[in-house]
């Protein structure tokens, strides 16, 4: 198919097959897959060379924005919206609309609800696409050797994977006591950025708090850190674990990268992280671990991770001089075959193409465990799904944010936990209201009511009232 597209481009006078395509991303652990696909693409499209630049995550947005403003943007790039929201990038003419290639038949290669106005489509035109299927983005990782050394095993010799808050507490207690100052039950790395909100995602969502660490509870449209008891209960649990010495002592100061290394060396038995950890650990020869997610007060989960339709990752620059060749690389990147190697060979994440996500076809057990968790991410409502004009609502971040507050709770600098959570709710709600007000003043028809879904059952998949294929 790609070959015929390029042949047609060449027949119409295009320069297909005689170009260097500049592409930017910030992926490091996923680099082996990207380089593999570039090699395959270049072999299949002789003469097109993909020149890849990997930028640091911390500087990518600034570099990308400068490149756009100086008319030196790469042909294909990973989308960054830290400074300029995607809808504004489209309005500024930074992104190339892809409709001359991404027609109805191309879009139907993807599952229903992959393309959504206000997310990856604007004015009915396609600008990006999802690469992955939504999945539980954070997991509780268990070092099997640490658990076995502590006697935390089942009758068959497998490790006792914690299912509840009490299970985690018991395991942390046993590991710490038997570790004699060499091994601890729990650990994390908070030195580079506040990472404790990740713990809220895993432990509080399962308790029935759909806002997790970031959003309002969309049943009411309100932020509920101070009014939802689950957040206070988890804060007390966190303080209890710390007070009893279950955490690796330097967790608050070491980086997440160092924490991952310490986990694989058995300095602590449990940590929170994402599937991106697995590739790094495999490179280091560490594969003896298990994982779970959504660990709540009870074994029966009262909430889930919630997904939205659509998705973005890569886009093509409106400045490109090689639109056909840039599209060819974009198309390859999002293809079923590339998705198959993404899942089954390189074990990176779920593919947007469901036929690639069969745990039985994955040989690496920890990644197969992750793929098998996909049912724990279910469709949820969203303001921008209900009203695409919500894309024009810009909500400014607040400080101190949840990560800063949790760090203060952990270190003991914050004594009034309930008051800190309630103050956070007030500031977050104010920022949301201000964002909506500013969008209204700009002429956009948005409302705080867009954030309220009173009939939402958080234990069941939400049915979106949007076209499956626009």
Question: Model-found features: residue ranges?
Answer:
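Long, aromatic- and glycine/proline-rich binding clefts that accommodate carbohydrate-like moieties
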Residues: 292-294, 344-411, 445-470
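Extracytoplasmic/periplasmic substrate-recognition and gating elements
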Residues: 43, 70, 244, 283-355, ...
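Hinge/lid segment of periplasmic solute-binding proteins
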Residues: 82-139, 290-293, 466-470
């Amino acid at each position: 198919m790609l070959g015929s597209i390029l042949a047609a481009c060449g027949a119409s006078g295009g320069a297909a097959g005689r170009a260097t395509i500049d592409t930017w991303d910030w992926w490091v652990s996923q680099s082996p897959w990207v380089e593999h696909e570039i090699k395959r693409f270049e072999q299949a499209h002789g003469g097109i060379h993909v020149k890849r630049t990997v930028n640091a995550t911390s500087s990518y947005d600034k570099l990308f924005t400068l490149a756009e403003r100086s008319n030196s943007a790469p042909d294909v790039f990973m989308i960054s919206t830290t400074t300029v929201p995607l809808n504004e990038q489209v309005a500024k003419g930074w992104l190339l609309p892809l409709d001359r290639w991404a027609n109805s038949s191309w879009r139907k290669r993807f599952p229903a609800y992959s393309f959504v106005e206000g997310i990856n489509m604007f004015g009915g035109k396609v600008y990006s696409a999802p690469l992955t299927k939504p999945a539980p983005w954070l997991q509780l990782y268990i070092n099997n050797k640490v658990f076995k050394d502590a006697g935390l095993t089942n009758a068959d010799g497998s490790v006792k994977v914690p299912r509840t808050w009490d299970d985690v507490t018991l395991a942390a207690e046993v590991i710490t006591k038997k570790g004699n100052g060499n091994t601890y039950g729990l650990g994390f790395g908070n030195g580079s950025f506040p990472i404790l909100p990740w713990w809220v995602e895993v432990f509080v969502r399962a308790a029935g708090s759909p806002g997790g660490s970031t959003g309002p509870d969309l049943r009411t449209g309100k932020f509920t850190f101070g009014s939802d008891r689950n957040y206070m209960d988890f804060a007390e649990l966190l303080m209890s674990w710390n007070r009893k010495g279950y955490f690796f002592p330097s967790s608050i100061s070491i980086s997440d990268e160092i924490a991952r290394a310490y986990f694989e060396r058995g300095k602590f038995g449990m940590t929170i992280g994402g599937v991106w950890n697995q590739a790094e650990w495999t490179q280091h020869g560490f594969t003896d671990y298990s994982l779970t997610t959504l660990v709540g007060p009870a074994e029966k989960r009262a909430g889930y991770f919630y997904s939205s339709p659509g998705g973005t990752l890569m886009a093509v620059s409106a400045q490109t001089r090689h639109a056909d060749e840039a599209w060819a690389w974009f198309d390859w990147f999002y293809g079923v075959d590339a998705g198959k190697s993404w899942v089954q060979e390189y074990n990176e994440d779920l593919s947007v193409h469901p036929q690639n996500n069969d745990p039985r076809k994955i040989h690496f057990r920890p990644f197969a465990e992750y793929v098998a968790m996909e049912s724990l991410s279910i469709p949820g409502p969203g303001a921008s799904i209900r009203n695409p004009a919500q894309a024009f609502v810009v909500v400014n971040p607040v400080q101190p944010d949840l990560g800063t507050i949790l760090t203060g709770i952990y270190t003991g600098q914050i004594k009034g936990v309930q008051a800190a959570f309630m103050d956070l709710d007030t500031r977050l709600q104010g920022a949301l209201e201000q964002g909506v007000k500013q969008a209204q003043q700009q002429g956009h028809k948005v409302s705080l009511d867009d954030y309220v879904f009173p009939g939402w059952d958080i234990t069941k998949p939400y049915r979106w009232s949007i076209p499956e294929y626009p």
